[in-house]
Amino acid sequence: MLKFLNQVTSYGKESFQAARYIGQGLAVTFDHMKRRPITVQYPYEKLIPSERFRGRIHFEFDKCISCEVCVRVCPINLPVVDWEFNKEIKKKQLKHYSIDFGVCIFCANCVEYCPTNCLSVTEEYELSTFDRHELNFDNVAMGRLPYKVTQDPMVTPIREFAYLPESEMDGHNVDHTAPRAGQTPAEIVASTPKPETKEG
């Protein structure tokens, strides 16, 4: 009889402990349900990159003087500059320029040190392909106009990377319907003062 009572008591303790652990897990789950979502419904929603975001490098063929400064400052000597010397004008003439974005570390040293500003960083970060050889961009591919998230009519731009309102450190107490920090592109345009036109 005593053995049976001990078994019942131990079973009751284990059941109570299991129920307590399940309750703790559900409490964490319900706590997360109150929080605002941090996921983005990509590709229908996209985050607006920050002001100094370093994405795909844009190249302007006509500005390049084939000085190869970009190759010297690159930590991995990545840019390929193919040029020939024109004896008539006694200057280098660029024939071909390419960067392999599958190897590029996006440090933007080439952009910073370029003497003619023929290189610039864009906010493009979608460089995925099925074949890694397609990431080797030549001067034609690098010369196309950069893509902007805010100018795509098929995409909803999300305000920014920060999801909490200003001066708020803990996300537990913030209502999930509260506005995000920062401004939307439309609000930025509306708050920008228009240039004054001279009449007369």
UniProtKB/Swiss-Prot annotation:
Q: Which GO terms describe its biological process?
A: photosynthesis, light reaction
Topologically, how does it sit relative to the membrane?
Answer: Peripheral membrane protein
Major location category of this protein: membrane
Catalytic activity from the UniProt record: a plastoquinone + NADH + (n+1) H(+)(in) = a plastoquinol + NAD(+) + n H(+)(out); a plastoquinone + NADPH + (n+1) H(+)(in) = a plastoquinol + NADP(+) + n H(+)(out)
Q: What is its EC number?
A: 7.1.1.-
Q: Give the PROSITE patterns listed for this entry.
A: 4FE4S_FER_1 (PS00198), 4FE4S_FER_2 (PS51379)
Cofactor binding mode and count? Binds 2 [4Fe-4S] clusters per subunit.
Q: Tell me the domain of life.
A: Bacteria
Ranges for domain 4Fe-4S ferredoxin-type come to: 55-84, 95-124
- The record's region (Disordered) falls at 175-200
- Cofactor names: [4Fe-4S] cluster
Q: Which residues bind [4Fe-4S] cluster 2?
A: 74, 104, 107, 110
Give this protein's Gene Ontology molecular function annotations: 4 iron, 4 sulfur cluster binding; iron ion binding; NADH dehydrogenase (ubiquinone) activity; quinone binding
Q: Which GO terms describe its cellular component?
A: plasma membrane-derived thylakoid membrane
Q: Where does this protein reside within or beyond the cell?
A: Cellular thylakoid membrane
What keywords appear on the UniProt entry? 4Fe-4S, Iron, Iron-sulfur, Membrane, Metal-binding, NAD, NADP, Plastoquinone, Quinone, Repeat, Thylakoid, Translocase
- Which positions does UniProt annotate for [4Fe-4S] cluster 1 binding? 64, 67, 70, 114
User: HAMAP family in the record, alphabetically?
Assistant: NDH1_NuoI
Its quaternary organisation is: NDH-1 is composed of at least 11 different subunits.
Protein family membership: Belongs to the complex I 23 kDa subunit family.
Q: What PANTHER family does UniProt report for this protein, alphabetically?
A: NAD(P)H-QUINONE OXIDOREDUCTASE SUBUNIT I, CHLOROPLASTIC (PTHR47275:SF1)
Q: What does this protein do?
A: NDH-1 shuttles electrons from an unknown electron donor, via FMN and iron-sulfur (Fe-S) centers, to quinones in the respiratory and/or the photosynthetic chain. The immediate electron acceptor for the enzyme in this species is believed to be plastoquinone. Couples the redox reaction to proton translocation, and thus conserves the redox energy in a proton gradient.
What protein name is recorded for this chain?
NAD(P)H-quinone oxidoreductase subunit I
What organism is the protein native to? Acaryochloris marina (strain MBIC 11017)
Q: What is the lineage of its organism?
A: Bacteria, Bacillati, Cyanobacteriota, Cyanophyceae, Acaryochloridales
